[in-house]
Design a protein with these regions (language model features):
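Short, surface-exposed loop/strand segments
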Residues: 1-100
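Acidic metal-coordinating catalytic centers involved in nucleic-acid phosphodiester chemistry
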Residues: 69, 73, 78-146
């Protein structure tokens, strides 16, 4: 399995292709929909389901130190969650068919530092406060679906 995944770690685009394929298979019965980033970006969401799952993926551009990897992942999560909870972006989400978000998945090939879990919890609380309880969980997936 590791060898299979390894071929998709060469770029963020390859990682995104793999993640989208996995989400399409896993959530096809829940109406999974990919969001292309070509026109005005994807707003911090790679795809979503009709059941309220949205996800964003991240693949490091190079071999970072543990601290650098944490910083890049933290910054990516912060940036994407900020878009996700922006009042300006709310009409875009609704226009895409995203009504009630129940879960936000951050899919990464690896993480080496518990601080990213602590940061995810901080962001979860931030989203809950903003959305007044409509997002139930923020989940970090490592190596796609553990």
């Amino acid at each position: 399995m590791i060898e299979f995944i390894q071929q998709y770690l060469s770029s963020g685009e390859e990682w995104e292709k793999l993640c989208n394929s996995c989400y399409r298979i896993r959530y096809q019965e829940q109406g999974y929909q990919e969001i292309p980033a070509k026109y005005k970006g994807d707003g911090g969401i790679e795809g979503f389901t009709k059941s309220g799952i949205v996800y964003q993926c991240y693949c490091p551009e190079k071999a970072y130190t543990d601290d650098e990897l944490y910083e890049h992942m933290r910054d990516k999560m912060t940036k994407d969650v900020s878009k996700f909870i922006s009042k300006d972006y709310e009409p875009v989400l609704k226009g895409l068919g995203i009504r009630d978000v129940r879960e936000w998945h951050f899919v990464v090939p690896e993480y080496k530092d518990k601080r990213i879990l602590e940061h995810a919890e901080k962001k979860r609380k931030e989203v809950l406060e903003y959305k007044k309880g409509t997002v139930n969980s923020v989940i970090i997936y490592r190596k796609i679906l553990q």
